[in-house]
């Protein structure tokens, strides 16, 4: 585990200079700042953001890393964390990663450098090993929608596989046998888990899995619309569609409407997440509820408590969608 002395030695500066760089002091030259940052990157040194934040009582901040704050799902998550931050006298800093490993890493590092008292992280592309390294150095780092081995007590996750199984079972119970699945094209854990949940439900009911009915698309309205167009172009008759999330379901409804297909009389559609958009769709969308507000609230409270060395509040480490 690298120390501040190791950084100073590699950068060719004093420990005091490294400390000034970490605290964004104006009394450092640009050459020193670059040398220190290069050494930190090479050594994978992550200063203990929690200890630094506690030494700056007037600068209490909470950080969150999300995929894309402009989407309804992540917008709800950020708002829930922000409400906890405000209630506890913290200011919220947000980092977007766009489901890219390099940007996830950079977002976490930037929040650490900004002396966050705790960090809630939604990161699907970084490896378990890299996240374990971060969590070992940052006691106030909490994962959401992912479980990192060895740090299960600091992870707030959802049973995505069960949720997709629940959605598929809902259509099967309505009598559907030819059911398509609109899958996320992002290579992330919950995309695989939800697709597997769909497969599980079909298998349990003796329905053959037709890979041609699993259509990938970006997890948004455009992706859902294009996926349904691709499905219709196959000429295969389906009576039900399970969607990776609600935005894809919204796009699916639009494409079906454009092609004169009535929902739910001709085809049934079910989403996943239960975000605000579902309240304004016509016809109304049946969806699986993702308790994102509860999960984000618990994650934020846990991060703050751990950052300050306080007893961890009671949390649910694995939520069950309904």
Name each region found by the language model.
Residues 91, 99, 117-166, 187, ...:
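Flexible loop/hinge segments that line or gate small-molecule binding clefts
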Residues 229-240, 244-322:
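Flexible loop/turn connectors
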Residues 177-178, 209-213, 262-269:
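Short acidic capping loops at alpha-helix termini that bridge into adjacent secondary structure
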Residues 1-60:
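N-terminal helix-turn-helix DNA-binding module of bacterial transcription factors
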Residues 35, 73-87, 163-170, 189-208, ...:
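Short, solvent-exposed amphipathic alpha-helices that sit
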Residues 1-3, 41-79, 87-90, 98-99, ...:
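N-terminal helix-turn-helix/winged-helix DNA-binding helices
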